[in-house]
Regions:
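Glycine-rich phosphate-binding loop used to anchor ATP phosphates in small-molecule kinases
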Residues: 54-118
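Hydrophobic positions on the alpha1 helix immediately C-terminal to the Walker A/P-loop
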Residues: 23, 27
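P-loop (Walker A) phosphate-binding loop of NTP-binding proteins
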Residues: 15
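Conserved substrate/cofactor phosphate-moiety recognition/catalytic segment
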Residues: 29-68
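Hydrophobic anchor at the beta1->P-loop junction of P-loop NTPases
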Residues: 12
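Conserved lysine of the Walker
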Residues: 20
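NTP-dependent small-molecule kinase module
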Residues: 134-195
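A glycine- and Lys/Arg-enriched "phosphate-lid" helix/loop adjacent to the NTP-binding pocket
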Residues: 90-159
């Protein structure tokens, strides 16, 4: 069973609207441990309105915010909604699509390599089909997400799957088109720690 004495640092990964925030909150409540929510960037609405103009600023802000969260959780344990690894996925997709200049991508790469970024003990990857992610994003209808291109969402899902297949850390992949209960997820995480 998870206890605060264990100081476990668990990251929840997945594309936009995969269900990360919901699961992160459920696990935090289930185990009564700290939760670092995904930061809401002051650039978010601007970014979705004009990817090219705001991509670099958005990505630098998100990396800095996530590192701050990882430093806290590496010391005290808890759950992190989206990990810094995922910032690299977003940056590559933006560069591949021409929404981030190569020099900005290289600057993000340099910054990423330079940051002190404690790693989660385990990352839970919520794998969804592109159509699931797109539908969930539409269903939640967040004002700041208006303007997300479906092609961008599809590209992100493919990039996440590639990342997961190459990830060298501890990864538990959950097929999240049909979410499990928090108890079922907690059982899988506890089983990971017991082995």
């Amino acid at each position: 069973m998870y206890t605060t004495n264990n100081r476990r640092y668990i990251g929840i990964a997945g594309t936009i609207a995969a269900g990360k925030s919901t699961l992160a909150k459920q696990l935090s409540d289930y185990w009564h441990v700290p939760l670092i929510k995904e930061p809401i960037s002051p650039y978010l609405a601007d970014f979705y309105a004009d990817n090219k103009e705001y991509a670099f600023r958005m990505q630098v802000y998100m990396m800095a915010s996530r590192v701050k969260g990882s430093l806290i959780l590496s010391r005290f344990g808890g759950i992190q909604d989206r990990t810094i690894y995922e910032d690299r996925i977003f940056q590559k997709v933006l560069c591949d699509r021409g929404d981030m200049e190569q020099r900005d991508y290289e600057t993000c790469s340099l910054l990423y390599k330079s940051l002190s970024k404690p790693s989660p003990d385990v990352v839970i990857y919520l794998k969804v089909k592109p159509e699931t992610s797109i539908q969930r994003q539409k269903d939640r209808a967040r004002v700041k997400e208006i303007g997300i291109d479906e092609g961008y969402m599809e590209h992100l899902v493919m990039a996440y799957n590639t990342w997961a297949s190459q990830f060298t850390g501890n990864l538990i992949t959950l097929h999240w088109d049909n979410p499990l209960s928090v108890e079922e997820v907690a059982e899988q995480i506890e089983s990971f720690y017991d082995n």
